[in-house]
């Protein structure tokens, strides 16, 4: 089951960068941003659910560091499932909102910064996992070894997931900025106007 879930997640990641061949406009860029978020949260939720189930079952059937590895996977992914669920509820609210260009740019920038912050946290998870594993090996402590291996595993997945989605959002943000750059204020003797260059 875990292999099928991983295959599903990897396949989904490949489709995150699909290109919309139609002319871009404000609504399609906002919908694209929300679609990238939705994909991210579904992948996180699927990963979390698979690891929560697998970790719970395997922890009771394992010994030594493997038991602690599966326990931490279950704990960690209980949080991931909750984050994904709350994020999807928030997306329903955002789908009902109407965004103007300035608000869309602000939302896009905040999201990109958030994903960069997450990649830093992911690297910290991996580093903490390496520390725990090393300490567990040095002190022959199964709990530290298992928890460390789990943090390395989960942190690595989250790092890849967040980076893939950061670059997808960055691409969408560039298209949004290109649209903004096509807007031009004109001031003349008869008044002011906003021009959109095609």
What are these regions (language model features)?
Residues 64-80:
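Loop-to-helix transition at the N-terminal end of transmembrane alpha-helices
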Residues 47, 79-80, 117-121:
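Alpha-helical transmembrane segments of multi-pass integral membrane proteins
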Residues 48, 52-55, 126-129, 159:
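Amphipathic, well-ordered alpha-helical segments in soluble domains
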